[in-house]
């Protein structure tokens, strides 16, 4: 009740001020249009004397503007205390329009009194313009009281609530990767840093094609880690994009290494620009389980659907058979023929020759007992099916160029050997992905085993477009390599792609064990998963209720997604969200980021123009200078086949000469 009385009293005061304002405006008209007033007969003697006294003592009418200014002041005060009904469509444009028009009519009409017309004409025009101006000013003032002070629709995408302070301090250590950023906070763009102070906790870079993964992040990983003396293994899906960056950056930063590193390339497309390396080098295989790992990697890369069927009979059988062949080649004459091409050629011999040879060795007899039972039991169809499961996919890999690269021994795969550090790039080709990925997967699996050891040089494994290759043991590498100073950086498009090619279980392990996450634009379940990973933050909510007589505003807070899935689904190229991990002695308070990664495009373009192509490694020339590439690799191809034929013939002959096993050789 008291509040209503107060409002009623306030209303009376405002009405009084408005009335005084109107009286002052009338006094202005009465004084400056006095002759017309006299003609109209509205002059009053008492009023005349009062106005003359006001003018004599206060100079009220010394200027035509004085009374107008006082009138406007009182009008403004009356409007200020008026509580109007809020209107959502009321805008400042409308208000400013009527205020400007009203001010012009109210203040700038003095010249009308000087027009060379009758006094009545002057007075009529003056009164009309002043009245119209006053009404416009009154409307503008009242509309201001009806204007909504807070437009809830100014931030329709909730950018202000979802922007947050990010890391602005540069944190550098001997392993860190540091990316400059620009982020939006409190209605302005700020400079910041993404500090990956512990790359050994693994990093993954997600984003749809064209989101800027390689340009903004992967390229920077390669450059900065070379600058800090990392040994590197780079899987270059679109060879030579990453390879040229690594090669040229290494040329300019050899001084970052205590021992000068060597640059090696595996490239099946062009043997001239490829080193040769045997991924199943017998020197690095100590147990038959190593042979099994190699066979497992090859077969699952050739048959991606088998990843979901691990443990099935027709999946394990060809893997075990290939593993036995690899181990046989390892123990035969101290690994003289222990290469993958030799294993393929051996597998393609008739099974009547394969099994007697393999079972001649005690350490393989038990390993192959299921095959021997099927053979001796007359289950020829089953046996042929098992062998065909291995032969058919491996036959796709029979290629002179591939045989050439995989039978040489230019270098070993222990890339982080402190005495012989290496930067190794392996190139794939999207057009031959299914064939090359299997061979390159073999290099991957061997490297994982060799680099994940104590007392080695700090190293980095960078895999671009991870789902295009099956990386056996990747989940274990991420989980255990931190203490061995192995940094892993994985690039792929989204989690569904990873799940499709690696299976649900392995995909989940990779997702949940990676410590540093970068994501460009991704959609669907991937965006939702990332949004949940980034967590929630306390956000302010404001609601407004407008009725005929009043407006009420309520402000509340609630926990909501810091970076919602909808934002992640619509990120601009070059803008990334993510989170980084820190160290005990290098705490990062704000690990989450949502920022544009700043890349000096002019500098990068200049660097790329100055890049040298990867040089020719092997010159395939005859004495007369003519090219003999085809002849050389074909000769190597025939040599591999002939070596296996010779091996098989000698072993069969030896078995025939062994009475205990001669029964395994069927009589012709």
Q: How does the language model describe each region?
A:
Residues 132-134, 467, 574:
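Glycine-centered small-residue hotspots that permit tight backbone geometry or close packing
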Residues 187, 191, 550-551, 601, ...:
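Intrinsic-disorder/low-complexity loop/linker signature
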Residues 1-211, 215, 220, 547-548, ...:
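Basic- and hydrophobic-enriched, low-structure N-terminal and domain-boundary segments
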């Amino acid at each position: 009740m008291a509040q209503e009385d107060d409002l009623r009293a306030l209303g009376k005061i405002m009405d009084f001020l408005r009335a005084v304002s109107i009286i002052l405006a009338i006094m202005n008209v009465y004084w400056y249009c006095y002759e017309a007033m006299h003609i109209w007969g509205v002059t009053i003697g008492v009023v005349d004397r009062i106005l003359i006294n006001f003018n004599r003592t206060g100079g009220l009418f010394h200027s035509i503007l004085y009374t107008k200014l006082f009138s406007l002041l009182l009008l403004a005060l009356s409007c200020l205390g008026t509580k109007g009904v809020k209107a959502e469509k009321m805008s400042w444009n409308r208000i400013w329009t009527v205020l400007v028009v009203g001010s012009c009519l109210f203040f700038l009409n003095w010249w009308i009194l000087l027009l060379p017309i009758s006094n009545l004409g002057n007075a009529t025009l003056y009164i009309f313009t002043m009245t119209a101006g006053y009404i416009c000013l009154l409307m503008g003032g009242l509309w201001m009281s009806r204007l909504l002070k807070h437009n809830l629709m100014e931030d329709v995408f909730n950018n202000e609530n979802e922007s947050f302070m990010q890391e602005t301090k540069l944190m550098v250590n001997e392993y860190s990767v540091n990316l400059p950023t620009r982020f939006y906070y409190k209605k302005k763009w700020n400079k910041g840093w993404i500090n990956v102070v512990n790359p050994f906790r693994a990093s993954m870079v997600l984003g749809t094609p064209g989101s800027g993964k390689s340009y903004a992040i992967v390229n920077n990983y390669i450059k900065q880690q070379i600058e800090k003396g990392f040994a590197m293994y780079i899987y270059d899906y679109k060879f030579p994009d990453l390879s040229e960056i690594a090669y040229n950056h290494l040329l300019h930063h050899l001084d970052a290494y205590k021992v000068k590193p060597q640059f090696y390339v595996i490239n099946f497309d062009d043997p001239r620009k490829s080193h040769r390396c045997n991924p199943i080098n017998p020197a690095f295989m100590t147990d038959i389980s190593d042979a099994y790992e190699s066979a497992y990697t090859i077969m699952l890369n050739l048959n991606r659907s088998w990843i979901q069927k691990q443990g099935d009979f027709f999946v394990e059988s060809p893997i075990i058979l290939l593993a036995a062949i690899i181990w046989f080649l390892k123990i035969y004459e101290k690994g003289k023929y222990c290469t993958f091409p030799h294993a393929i050629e051996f597998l393609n011999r008739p099974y009547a020759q394969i099994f007697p040879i393999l079972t001649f060795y005690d350490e393989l007899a038990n390993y192959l007992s299921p095959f021997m039972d099927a053979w001796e039991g007359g289950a020829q169809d089953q046996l042929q099916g098992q062998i065909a499961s291995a032969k058919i996919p491996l036959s796709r890999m029979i290629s002179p160029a591939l045989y050439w690269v995989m039978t040489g021994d230019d270098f070993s795969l222990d890339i982080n050997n402190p005495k012989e550090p290496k930067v190794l790039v392996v190139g794939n080709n999207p057009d031959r992905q299914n064939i090359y990925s299997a061979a390159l997967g073999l290099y991957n699996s061997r490297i994982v085993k060799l680099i994940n050891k104590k007392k080695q040089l700090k190293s980095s494994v960078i895999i671009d477009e991870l789902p295009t290759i099956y990386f056996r043991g990747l989940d274990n590498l991420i989980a255990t390599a931190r203490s061995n100073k192995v940094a892993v950086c994985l690039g792929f498009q989204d989690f569904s792609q990873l799940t499709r090619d690696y299976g649900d279980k392995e995909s989940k392990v990779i997702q949940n064990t990676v410590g540093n996450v970068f994501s460009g634009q991704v959609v669907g379940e991937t965006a939702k998963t990332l949004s949940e990973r980034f967590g929630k933050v306390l956000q302010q909510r404001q609601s407004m209720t407008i009725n005929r007589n009043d407006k009420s505003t309520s402000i509340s807070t609630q926990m909501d997604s810091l970076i919602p899935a909808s934002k992640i689904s619509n990120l601009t190229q070059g803008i990334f969200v993510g989170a980084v991990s820190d160290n005990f002695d290098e705490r990062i308070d704000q690990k989450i980021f949502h920022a544009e990664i700043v890349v000096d495009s002019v500098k990068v373009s200049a660097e790329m123009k100055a890049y040298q192509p990867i040089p020719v490694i092997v010159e395939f020339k005859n004495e007369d200078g003519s090219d003999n590439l085809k002849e050389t690799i074909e000769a190597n191809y025939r040599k591999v086949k002939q070596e296996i034929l010779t091996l098989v013939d000698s072993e069969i002959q030896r078995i025939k000469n062994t009475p205990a096993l001669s029964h395994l050789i069927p009589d012709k």
